[in-house]
Amino acid sequence: IYVGKLADVKIQPGFQRMMIKGSMKYLATAKTCIIELVGYDKVFTTDIDRTQPEFSYEIKDVEEGNYYVKITTKDKEGNTSLSETYNVDVYGTEHIATYYPKRITDIQFVIADNSLNLIWNQADNVVEAIVKYYDSNEQLLTLTVKGDAASTNLPNWKATSILTVETRILPSETALDIVSLPISEYTLPDDPIVEIPRTNFA
């Protein structure tokens, strides 16, 4: 006697974790779900809760790498379903280190209003960048820049102060966790020297 299988299974990768989700539409008699990380000697057993809209189970503290996940359901008599195996790539520190941060490639002074334009590179998988800098009153300001932004204007800034950029990435569309890359530091320029025309002086 075979028990119904977990249907429409999706395994989302996270930072050293994974989330298993699926439909319980065929689990009329199933009581427990058995999840095995093939080749790692790790087996997890969890009760099936039909009061929830879908099945979900999180596996934490997993080393980054590629995993084959075998899923089986079992009824109260010990009968099991046919097992299904799925593949997932869990990411960690080493994988995150392969991504490029959002960087300032140029800082342009705007004479008209004494502001600065920050010119950005284009980097893959960037969700946003958190920019922190000091204004002319030495107040620390925080600015969130969209991942695909080409430039950002700073209307009020302190000359020769430090500006920091924290890049936040999502490794894939199905990834669970947004991860921060190491913070980059930049020194803002000095106030430009404006030469006064001498034509009106004797």
Tell me what each language-model feature is.
Residues 1-28, 79-124, 174-201:
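Pro/Thr/Ser/Gly-rich low-complexity, intrinsically disordered linker/stalk tracts
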Residues 11, 26-65, 130-160:
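Recognizes extended acidic, P/S/T-rich segments that occur
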Residues 17-19, 43, 67-70, 96:
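Residues in flexible loops and secondary-structure boundaries
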Residues 21-23, 36, 58, 70, ...:
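Beta-strand residues in well-ordered beta-sheet regions across diverse protein folds
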Residues 52-53, 66, 101-104, 161-165, ...:
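Short C-terminal domain-edge/linker segments immediately following a structured domain
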Residues 57-90, 151-188:
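Beta-strand-rich modules
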